[in-house]
Amino acid sequence: MLRKNPYSWWLGVPLACAALVACAGTVLQPAEVKATGLTREQAQEVLLVALKHQDYQLNKPGVFVDGDLQDDSGQPPHPGYFDFSLGYNDPKAGATEYWGLFSVSTATGDVWEINSCKRLDGSELRALQGQIMARTGKTLADEEPQRQGLGCEDQP
């Protein structure tokens, strides 16, 4: 007859907790935002906050955010922004479906889906953006010249 080792349970608990923390991802700490603005990793965290309240199934297996979008010089295509694509690798179809292309302002955390020129919004995102702007000293009005580079009109 098999017997369970009581000590294996105690080993399993810390391992399960470590796995849960690793899977949960990081949460942007506004105090870590520098006056120069968001890093690529921080901008991706802002995007994830914005996407939580959209109609995307982010927990679906195969969903990904690609944050390595660069021009031929290795720079982000839109100055003052980091660009990310959101997509889904469908294992049954053997295909990748892209759901959107998003730009996140390094100075304010402003988030746009640039294919549809839709500014993402939500109370949690606005609160985070307020904290980012407090750290950078920038406002949405300050970044209007960079925002024009997205090719999208400001929304009322």
Predicted regions and their residues:
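Bacterial N-terminal signal peptides that target proteins for export
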Residues: L2-V13
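Short, non-transmembrane alpha-helical segments in secretory-pathway proteins
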Residues: L28-D72, R135, T139-D142
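Cystatin/cathelin-like cysteine-protease inhibitor module
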Residues: Y56, P61, W99-F102, T106-M133
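Exposed beta-strand-loop-beta-strand "reactive/processing" segments of non-cytosolic proteins
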Residues: N59-A107
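C-terminal partner/receptor-binding element of secreted or periplasmic proteins
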Residues: S116-P156
